[in-house]
């Protein structure tokens, strides 16, 4: 059966294409219609020749293993790390996706909630956080709806059309919750859900305070594309009582701490990266943290330089490559700073003339919006600390001048 790559810009059309192809045992590559030229080139080099592309014009150039497509008929290839130019597709199949859905179902059942999961999705379906609410509903006999997640101040909040029975789940990031709470009806709107899964970047204090003060049914979740979205959550009552944010693993999930790095054993873990390495068990997340005696995990940040901006993972090295290629930059260091709206925002510290700022901003238009620096710091030399490493505090002070 011929494979398909889906790039529709309309979310409902996108989901229909993915679900129809998957039900017909067609391998499905999920593409981001907003990818820039670099991301599309990277994706085309991975998607096998002969794959039918829907939604955009793209010519697949990728190679495929000898058992393609027969050995991959129930697979979904979900993108990760696309922001910044280099795309990877995580391989999931029906078994891993079902394990993720049923793991959440069982964890919520243990808390007295219905095993029928209705999902309201507010992120694009090419993100695992936008896809999984739909699959959870399918695996548990629930219903789902996809809604505009921008929550613009001049628009009314979307009407959620889900059945009364069952567990109504919203999947949101903290930026969205902040915008919803600014709306006069925001608090009432949020409380229509039994469960609000809060993912993405570290949660700012004002959002935590709002969750606590209004007793919102927020489950601070931890997970990634590789684990088919969340693999643990911190339940609302822990947040309300001002306890540390700890992720309690879903059934079948185990966290392992190795040299302060977090590894995950999970039945929902993907098979590997397409045309790349298989995932080891346990899977190394790249996150720093601590595993407590009760098995819960506390995440302390990334062990690499990845920036998480509005739920998008941004690779600073790719941005640096694009800016260096202009020939206008003698030295550069891209990093993330805390941002109340986005979690983190991208900042470029550059040894360059400020007169070239317009040209630099033009150069990064080949990247997704999330990967384009929101601020530029023009310096004579990159600030370094006594160890010869990038001095983040010095750079942040320059940013405030």
What are the functions of these language-model segments?
Residues 182-240:
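Gly/Ser/Thr-rich phosphate-binding loop
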Residues 266, 281, 288-371:
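AMP-binding/adenylate-forming catalytic core of the ANL superfamily
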